[in-house]
Amino acid sequence: MFFQLSGDFEARKILAQLSGLTPNDTTNKHSAKIIFGDERKPQKDFVYTDLSKTFPGYVYDFGKSTYRGETTGEGGYVYSEPGMYYNVAVLDVASMHPTSIEQLNLFGPYTKRFSDLKKARVLIKHGDVEAAGKILDLHIDETTNLKGLSDALKTVLNSVYGLTSAHFDNPFRDLRNKDNIVAKRGALFMIDLKHAVQDLGYQVVHIKTDSIKIPDATPEVIAFIMEFGRKYGYEFEHECTYEKMCLVNDAVYIAKKINGDKSVWESVGAQFAHPYVFKKMFSREKIE
């Protein structure tokens, strides 16, 4: 068990090194310390954005959000047109929620520190450890556990979004933020993107929070989506193109993609992911 969790413990120790707290302190305490320092009430400097000014027509009323004739939900936007499709481009927004926090300047003067953590993780991923060390004010050399450092930063970045929308009191919670504007900005953006792509004559068959799928995609529509995202501060990545995809509903699909010289099946949802079903019907792996 120790060896299985040793990587997590290494990340925990690096988290403590960044925050100055102990490895036994909670993730929430580490995150607050790293971003807000010793400020106990950072909320007084937070920025709350009325999204109806950025997205005219958006309404939040008695816990229900509507925009462009749709009920958006209070988390990520989900949309599907079940069916069988071919040549399906899959494009994902890189770090949607952290980017929304940056674009909203959610934490006011503390947003830069949050952005620095995000930048440092990208730099580590690309091997520029010297620049990452300068941003973090941390000495990094050949003995540094880079995976542990990256995991520690990921822990902070991932925990912060949940804390902004939590119903319990914490340093990241703004009482004005009733409509979860971090997730909502991404959702409203994806609705605008869906309409923009449809207006070009393409079909949008699936949207799941930060991902969009378009069948019979051309290089032109892929370039359009990437440029559309940049206008809102989002960077899209062309994750893959499915040779074919069977979409059952907004949470279940099976798809085949070309990976180098061979085809690879990818399943999402319990029905197709069941080992016997997946191996017997799709991957043709030996069933033991």
Describe each model-derived feature in a short phrase.
Residues 11-17, 51, 113-123, 253, ...:
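Generic hydrophobic, helix-prone segments enriched in Leu/Val/Ile
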